[in-house]
């Protein structure tokens, strides 16, 4: 199956040159700030990381280089990781994972998600350049900090995608859980976007798109306790005015509010003449669902392949 998917993604590649020189520019830049461009990357089934691990948290992902902790902003959480294969002469589509299970910090240091790592490894092996971003958390960074961080990260990717063989015209962010809200907010609120934060499409998985009327403590920490402001913080109106293609997915075993919000987003977009591609997952969703690494997300993987094909076809005569 993986070989078949590799062929599908490789078909989506477009020709370019100069990756070797770009890689040297990247290495020089990383050395200048004390970083190593060749940090280890994960296998398909990484072992648990030791407590004191920072970036050396997994074994090798054959054929893929992971570059860690690239700063896109001033905060310690404003960092990106990237996974890319050494493929001179090719500009590849770019995916950016915006994945997070919560809106607020619990005061502990969060480990890198092994599911995101696996998805990045798979993407790098199959004709894509994959980034993952972390972002600021409430209560220190309330709404709209998440959306602004997405904008800053996408802007950084625009400026630097070529260093990893990526095509800045084919950037597809993938938001999961709380990250789906931040990505949706970025898309829906043009005032949070930056001049070079254009995306070619987006994938939203198991998110909320309007604060609940009775939010939990983490959401209240991010959105505030004044429910009269929640409509203004909603992504639903703004998403009807964007022109990039969307994929919206949720799981049939998600909490009911996630199912309801996914269905509401779909209905709202279709009512505005901007129907998204949708996928209903049979198991609990995860960042790895976009590549069907859980064996239960073939529909979502198909939607992503269709989206990449649609975006790639725009450059054809």
Where would I find each of the regions flagged by the language model?
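Short amphipathic alpha-helix adjacent to the substrate-entry channel of hydrolases
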Residues: 109-131
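Mobile cap/lid helix-loop segments that gate and shape the active-site cleft of serine hydrolases
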Residues: 59-62, 200, 207-238, 244
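Primarily recognizes the serine-hydrolase "nucleophile elbow" in alpha/beta-hydrolase
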Residues: 152-218
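N-terminal cap/lid segment of alpha/beta-hydrolase-fold proteins
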Residues: 25-90
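Serine-hydrolase catalytic-loop signature spanning alpha/beta hydrolases and amidase-signature enzymes
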Residues: 102-110, 130, 156
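C-terminal catalytic histidine-bearing segment of alpha/beta-hydrolase fold enzymes
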Residues: 249, 256-259, 263-266, 270-317
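Short beta-strand/loop motif that positions the catalytic acidic residue
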Residues: 242, 248-250
């Amino acid at each position: 199956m993986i070989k078949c998917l590799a062929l599908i993604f490789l078909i989506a590649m477009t020709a370019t040159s100069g990756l070797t020189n770009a890689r040297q520019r990247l290495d020089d830049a990383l050395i200048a700030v004390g970083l190593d461009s060749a940090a280890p990357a994960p296998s398909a089934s990484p072992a648990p990381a030791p407590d004191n691990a920072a970036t050396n948290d997994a074994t090798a992902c054959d054929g893929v280089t992971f570059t860690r902790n690239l700063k896109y902003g001033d905060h310690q959480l404003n960092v990106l990781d990237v996974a890319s294969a050494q493929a001179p002469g090719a500009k590849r589509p770019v995916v950016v994972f915006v994945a997070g299970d919560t809106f607020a910090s619990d005061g502990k240091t969060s480990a890198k998600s092994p599911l995101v790592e696996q998805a990045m490894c798979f993407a790098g092996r199959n004709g894509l350049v994959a980034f993952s971003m972390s972002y600021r958390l409430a209560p220190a960074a309330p709404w709209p900090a998440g959306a602004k961080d997405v904008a800053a990260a996408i802007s950084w990717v625009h400026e630097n995608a070529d260093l990893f063989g990526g095509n800045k015209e084919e950037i597809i962010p993938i938001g999961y859980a709380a990250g789906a809200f931040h990505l949706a907010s970025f898309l829906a609120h043009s005032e949070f976007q930056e001049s070079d934060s254009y995306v070619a499409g987006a994938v939203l998985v198991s998110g909320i798109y309007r604060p609940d009327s009775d939010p939990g403590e983490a959401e209240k920490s991010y959105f505030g306790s004044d429910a009269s402001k929640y409509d203004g913080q909603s992504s639903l109106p703004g998403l009807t005015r964007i022109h990039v293609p969307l994929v919206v997915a949720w799981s049939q075993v998600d909490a009911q509010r996630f199912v309801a919000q996914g269905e509401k987003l779909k209905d709202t977009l279709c009512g505005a003449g901007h129907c998204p591609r949708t996928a209903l997952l049979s198991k609990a969703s995860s960042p790895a669902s976009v590549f069907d690494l859980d064996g239960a997300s073939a529909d979502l993987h198909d939607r992503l392949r269709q989206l990449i094909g649609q975006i790639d076809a725009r450059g054809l005569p």
